[in-house]
């Protein structure tokens, strides 16, 4: 398989970092092809008789990623360790973290030369730590690499205990400009509750979603959500994010009352039922899927071209994950009758106002630098990790590199970017009360 240029660069940079540090994390947005990149990295570094462990946190991803891996590396055998199968024979073993972290499975685990963690912002969780510690007990020289779109966790905990460097970061804006993701067409819609949402209490991980439900889950607001959706995206496959299960059910019911084929997915939805619903969404039997936070990760349905946010996001990473579900491009061979030029984002929760752009960092160089040897890096003053030179935020501890590039950034914005012409946001005042522009 031929990698895209940015994928090849990311794989090369990760390999260089592994030679130096024995660990690294790669930051790449939804749609960048993380599974392809991790597969290519394994293939690049694989040696005869090596054992590689690939860890996923969702059941449906284990076999999906193993199949993609085999297309990239047909000469490296794979096997599965999950709730229904325990096969340790493969040269590359794909496993679900919940299964592998159980004591009896840890006891049967073989020695590994490399561990790859998908959605690696979860790597400091207790279940992952049990696995990593056992792997290191068996082989202290094991290489550990992580791939994630959102390294900055909502709870602000750093990843330093697992990764001491970020070898490469791919930005959403870059992939949109190069045609590998579609651009978001974003509408921030005021339904008269903006001030109330801004005053919602924060918890450790997010806003208090019970309070959000009391503000947002009203028949009049739900009707407005459907009306605006019909006006701006009524012919599009859509994923809706709500605050609670009750909120999601009420929004789903409102869609159905409007004769829209809609289903709900929650954390309690059985795995097979969820797979069927998402299959039906992708293939046109369902138009809208309403969920709480189930579809923020590990969900791949390229025909989805509308994202509706009926809740605020206290952390930028959550917003990026949600909107990212709609930015994938279409493979004409898989979906020959689907045309997708952009993704409509309807933000009723004012997340866009809070967080702005989807990119976590800004490239102050203004043009792609010529690569020769190792990618340029800088040292984070907070945790001493190596991170890409262009990063505005440390992927390991969350430190913001604000002051160093402020003057250059202001010059860049003022001279190179017409924010009025290029802004993806549009305000809509539904109540003519002057609270929107």
Predicted regions span which residues?
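Conserved pre-motif I regulatory segment
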Residues: 1-27
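Walker A/P-loop
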Residues: 20-41, 241, 265
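Conserved Walker A/P-loop ATP-binding site and its immediately adjacent core
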Residues: 36-37, 46-71, 245-246
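Conserved helicase ATPase core of P-loop NTP-dependent helicases/translocases
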Residues: 63, 79-88, 249-256, 260-296
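Conserved helix/coil segment N-terminal to the catalytic DExD/H
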Residues: 83-114, 125, 129-130
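Conserved RecA-like P-loop NTPase helicase motor core
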Residues: 98, 267-362, 367
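Post-DEXD/H (motif II) to motif III coupling segment of the RecA-like Helicase ATP-binding lobe
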Residues: 121-186
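Conserved interdomain linker/interface between the two RecA-like ATPase lobes of SF2 helicase motors
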Residues: 166-239
């Amino acid at each position: 398989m031929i990698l895209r240029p940015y994928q090849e660069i990311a794989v090369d940079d990760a390999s260089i970092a592994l030679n130096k540090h024995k660990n690294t994390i790669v930051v790449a947005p939804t749609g960048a092809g993380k599974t392809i990149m991790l597969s290519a990295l394994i293939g690049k570094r694989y040696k005869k008789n090596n054992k590689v462990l690939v860890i996923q946190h969702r059941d449906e991803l284990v076999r999906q990623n193993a199949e993609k891996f085999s297309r990239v590396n047909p000469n490296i055998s794979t096997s599965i360790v999950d709730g229904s199968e325990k096969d340790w024979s493969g040269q590359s073993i794909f496993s679900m973290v919940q299964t592998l972290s159980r004591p009896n499975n840890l006891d049967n685990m073989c020695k590994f030369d490399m561990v790859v963690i998908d959605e690696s912002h979860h790597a400091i969780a207790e279940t992952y730590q049990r696995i990593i510690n056992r792997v290191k007990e068996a082989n202290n020289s094991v290489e550990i690499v992580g791939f994630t779109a959102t390294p900055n966790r909502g709870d602000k905990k750093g990843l330093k205990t697992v990764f001491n460097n970020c070898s490469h970061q791919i930005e959403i804006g870059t992939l949109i400009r190069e045609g590998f993701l579609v651009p978001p067409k974003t509408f921030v819609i005021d339904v008269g509750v903006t001030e109330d949402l801004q005053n919602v209490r924060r918890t450790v991980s997010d806003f208090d979603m019970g309070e959000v439900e009391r503000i947002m889950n009203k028949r009049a607001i739900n009707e407005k959500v459907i009306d605006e959706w019909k006006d701006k995206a009524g012919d599009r496959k859509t994923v809706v994010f709500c605050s609670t299960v009750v909120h999601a059910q009420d929004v789903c019911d409102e869609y159905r009352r409007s004769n829209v084929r809609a289903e709900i997915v929650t954390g309690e939805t059985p795995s097979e039922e969820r797979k069927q619903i998402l299959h039906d969404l992708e293939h046109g039997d369902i138009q809208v899927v309403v969920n709480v936070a189930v579809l923020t990760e590990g969900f791949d349905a390229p025909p989805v071209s509308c994202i509706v946010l009926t809740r605020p996001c206290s952390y930028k990473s959550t917003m990026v994950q949600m909107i990212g579900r709609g930015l994938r491009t279409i493979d004409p061979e898989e979906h020959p009758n689907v045309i997708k030029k952009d993704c409509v984002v309807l933000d009723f929760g004012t997340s866009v106002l809070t967080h702005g752009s989807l990119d976590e960092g800004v490239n102050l160089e203004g043009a792609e630098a010529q690569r020769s040897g190792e990618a340029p890096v800088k040292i984070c003053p907070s945790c001493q990790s190596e991170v890409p030179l262009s990063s505005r935020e440390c992927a390991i501890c969350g430190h913001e590199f604000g002051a160093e590039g402020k003057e250059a950034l202001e010059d860049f914005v003022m001279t190179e970017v017409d924010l009025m012409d290029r802004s993806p946001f549009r305000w809509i005042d539904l109540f003519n009360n002057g609270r929107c522009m």
